[in-house]
Design a protein with these regions (language model features):
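Solvent-exposed serine/threonine-rich low-complexity stretches and specific carbohydrate-binding patches
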Residues: 2, 237-248, 391-400
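Hydrophobic helix-and-loop "lid/oligomerization" segment in the mid-to-C-terminal part
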Residues: 38-111
Length: 400
């Protein structure tokens, strides 16, 4: 048997009226499962007799995919995986309709069925829309707006919110994925041709042509990405700079697609000057059908600012670091920020229990002549053991 818990972790019992109640003094009720009808077996028998099977699985936006519910795994519910496995074994013409508002790790599911159709939840026309796409009445042209990973091992600790250091999202993840950001299939194919790029006042203009090389009319979602080469800081591998869904392109038809990228959209926050800057240098623009299906690319030089250099004779705020390891940003005094050592999942308010050593790195301190004596002033809130290390063997240890 098994017991039940309420949402606030209290045991459940059955009262005299036969209703579920929360335990106060009563012992928790013990329940047993009695199988009246095996739904999976019934689905399997039905699948054996059918020409095609449509298996609808996924999540519910008011139960397990609502706000405040954190998943502990990317996997599908085991019962759903087992259902598809048994139905697909009974009928190889099984199409899975996955209703989901977030990514799943469905690599094994992908091997079991010939087609998977993804749709977000909601909408009273959901059924009609799915039917139109499955029958070819409407062109399939949806694109995933998140990266779909192979497994939980591809992600860092769920308490680690740093997408750069944790290498999350299409911008920083550098390994193979199940479905890349922007991915989606169509009933036809497209070629990309004649990319052009030019600078205008305050913006970059990018254009290309797409050609329907298939036999059916369809839509294509053309995506523009950008990457800053040789940046002082770690910039995204690719960053979406624009996209356009081009509707109803007939076979052999050619359409022109135009993008305008404002220069301020290429800025990043510079921790040295503590403001947004447009870094000068070489920018790579890429056009494609997804973040990993790049068809055309060109580079262009953009005039901007040189990345800053740190002045050793001015105060550098502790939270204006270039890199870190095992550190938290936290509340300081008088509304300021501070940095404290800790690991993902630690409570930064319990600094005495954060026992790991942390590292902060500040690049590009420039001395215009070699100093004979170096004085470093550090401001700390609590007793700490601090070691300052430079590139040329400079090491200072202080215990405030």
């Amino acid at each position: 048997g098994f017991t039940l818990e309420s949402w606030n972790k209290k045991q459940v019992f059955v009262d005299k009226a036969g209703y579920f109640s929360i335990c106060v003094d009563n012992p928790a009720a013990e329940f047993e499962i009695e199988i009246v009808k095996d739904g999976k077996k019934a689905a399997e028998k039905t699948a054996e007799k059918a020409d095609y099977v449509v298996a609808v699985i996924g999540c519910d936006p008011v139960i397990n995919s609502k706000e405040e519910v954190d998943r502990t795994t990317l996997g599908l519910p085991p019962e759903q995986e087992e259902l598809v496995k048994e139905v697909a074994a009974a009928n190889h013409n099984t199409i899975v309709v996955l209703i989901s508002n977030y990514p799943y790790a469905i690599g094994e599911l992908q091997k079991q069925v010939p087609a998977i159709l993804l749709s977000a939840s909601g909408s009273q026309e959901l059924g009609h829309g799915i039917a139109d796409v499955m029958t070819g009445k409407a062109s399939a042209a949806g694109r995933v707006n998140m990266t779909w990973y192979h497994s939980d091992e591809d992600l860092p600790d769920m308490n680690d919110y740093d997408i750069i250091q944790g290498k999350r999202t299409y911008q920083y993840f550098d390994r193979e994925v199940l479905y890349p950001f922007g991915y989606g299939m169509s009933y036809t194919t497209f070629s990309y041709e004649k990319m052009q790029i030019k600078k205008e006042r305050g913006c970059i203009k990018v254009s290309c042509f797409i050609r329907n090389t298939g036999e059916k009319t369809g839509d294509e979602v053309v995506q523009l990405y950008v990457h800053k080469k040789d940046s002082r800081v770690k910039r995204p591998i690719k960053q979406l700079a624009g996209f356009e869904r081009v509707h109803n392109i007939k076979p052999k038809e050619v359409r022109k697609v135009n993008f305008t990228v404002q220069l301020w959209e290429l800025e990043y926050y510079d921790v040295i000057s503590e403001r947004m800057i447009l870094e000068d240098g070489n920018y790579q623009f890429m056009v494609g059908a997804s973040s990993q299906d790049i068809r055309l690319e060109q580079s262009i030089m953009i005039d901007g600012l040189h990345a800053g250099k740190r002045n050793p004779f001015q105060t550098t705020a502790a939270d204006c670091y270039d890199a870190y390891d095992h550190m938290f940003l936290h509340r300081g005094i008088n509304g300021s920020s501070c940095v404290i050592p800790g690991s993902a999942g630690d409570d930064p308010d319990m600094i005495g229990e954060c026992l790991v050593e942390g590292t902060l790195i500040y690049h590009d301190f420039v001395f215009y002549k070699k100093p004979r004596k170096l004085n470093i002033t550090l401001k700390v809130l609590e007793t700490a053991h601090i070691t300052v290390t430079g590139e040329n063997g400079v090491q200072i240890t202080a215990e405030p």
